[in-house]
Amino acid sequence: MENILLKIKKLILENKIALFLTVYLVINTLFLTKYPFMHSDESWLSGLSRIYLENNSPIITESFFDLFPRFPHSIKIFFHYIQAFFSNIMGYNLFTFRFISLLFGVFTLYIIYKIGQKILKSKVSSFFLMLIVAFDVHFIYTSHFARQEAVILFSIIFAFYFYICKKPSLKKSIILGIITGLNIGIHPNSLFIAAIIGSLYVYDIIFIQKIKAKELLIYIFVTGIFAAVFIAINLYFDSNFFHNYKEFGDQFNVFAQPTDRISEIKNFYLKLYYQVSGTYYIPNIKFQLLFFPLIFALSFIKFIIKKDFSKYRYMGLIIFTILAINITYIIIGRYNQTSIIFIFPFFWMLFIINFKDIKYKNIISLLVAILVLIISIFNIIPFLNNDYKDYIENISKHVDSNEAVLANLNTEYYFSCNNLYDYRNLNYLKENHITFSEYINKNNIEYIVYPEEMDFIYNTRPVWNFIYGNLYYYYEDMQNFLENNCELIYRFDSPYAMRLSMYMYEKNWFVKIYKVNY
């Protein structure tokens, strides 16, 4: 018995990182669909992945948008096929698609541990680096969110690790170009990877002078080939790709003047600090947003004073990476709150590097890890009773999944493919010269799942017009139709009746289910 216990102890000690990551994975699955609240972006993405499978083709658009302008493209094609693969194995539900993000989150933590070993030369310090990132609420949020951020973050961290581990070579530049290029098929945020790798090359070319500029040019060339291929595929999918993509980008000020984009970065960070958002959840990251600038300032001052660019190479590379990410925010101009996670691991790396040579570094790291965990717990606990499953079950009691329905996109995981029509379509009734009632009849819609947020948005217009467009054109027609042509069959309260995150838990919001009378 004693020998068995000794073997178990030895196995645990030898595989403690794998054990930690396994436990981390299991614990996170327990509240994977509860934190954060489900966002319609998640069902939007997985809904298109389901359409890929249904039609055996990526040259398709979302079935829940018939009036809302959508055009086929290949920019997220790999991500959709990753989702389709997992959907075939685990079923079509929120847990499946969030589990993908969680897996990539766990892979990211392992690479962060390996980065720590490379730059810190200490397994203990590397473990604390991984632990702090794992406990960070925004990392947990990203690992629980069925969007592409977790995949892009993994690619960023892996590319950074690959760069610092491999000696300069043609092969290295080509592989980094391939990593960046493949991520174009995940999300346009692959630009962050390009900016980061470019900044690493620039640092080494200028300060270390052991890398030639041609290696950077090779990286740019390989990445450019992938970009050209994706552009060609997009033009094959949609001959008006450039025009349509520009129109889509205009909605998010992607093509705003450079001066406007530069000035907006201040508001970006202020909104994150004060948790100001539209429909996206923003965790309380005030501690990080106050702590990170202090760490950056300390690192930058040390880097400038020491002037030993070789000795402090890793610190310099991380500083350049953080600057590159911020410049990319400005270049893209969209300032999506979810993309802030790309910068977090690098700030935590700076923190660990700055304290790696002091006597009580492990105690300080442990205290910071505990503080970060406490902050995360206080962020997460309020959501543990917020079960998306309850929302869907309330609808399922009165509406069959095979019925045609007008509803919010956050119901998409319940309904069968091609049966859901989203409220975003209604903003295009006017330009299509049809009324609300004609739209319902045209699509043979049997049920209307009506969230109270529609009334709130209408009554506070134009403040929240960006959610569903201007409701003024069809709101009265919709209310008359609900009153005269429908029967109210069920009413229940749910936070999912309000998509605006700042109001979701302010009061009880209600969902009404109407049956259309034909």
PLM region spans:
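Signature aromatic-anchored transmembrane alpha helix within multi-pass, membrane-resident enzymes
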Residues: A18-T22, I174, I178, I220-I225, ...
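Transmembrane alpha-helical segments
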Residues: S190, I332, N354-K356, I363-D387, ...
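Hydrophobic/aromatic-rich transmembrane helices and adjacent perimembrane loops
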Residues: S46, L102-L103, T142-S143, E149-I152, ...
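Transmembrane-lumen/periplasm boundary regions of multi-pass, lipid-linked membrane glycan transferases
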Residues: I51, A194, G198-S310, G333
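Transmembrane-helix motifs of polytopic, lipid-linked glycan transferases
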Residues: A18, F99-L120, F158
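Extracytosolic helix-loop segments that constitute the early lumenal/periplasmic catalytic or substrate-binding loops
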Residues: I27-F31, S43-S74, F78-Y81, F85
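Aromatic/acidic, Gly/Pro-rich catalytic loop(s) in extracytoplasmic/lumenal soluble domains
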Residues: F355, E453-Y518
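Membrane-interface transmembrane helices that cradle and orient dolichyl/undecaprenyl
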Residues: Q117-L120, I157-S173, N183, F355
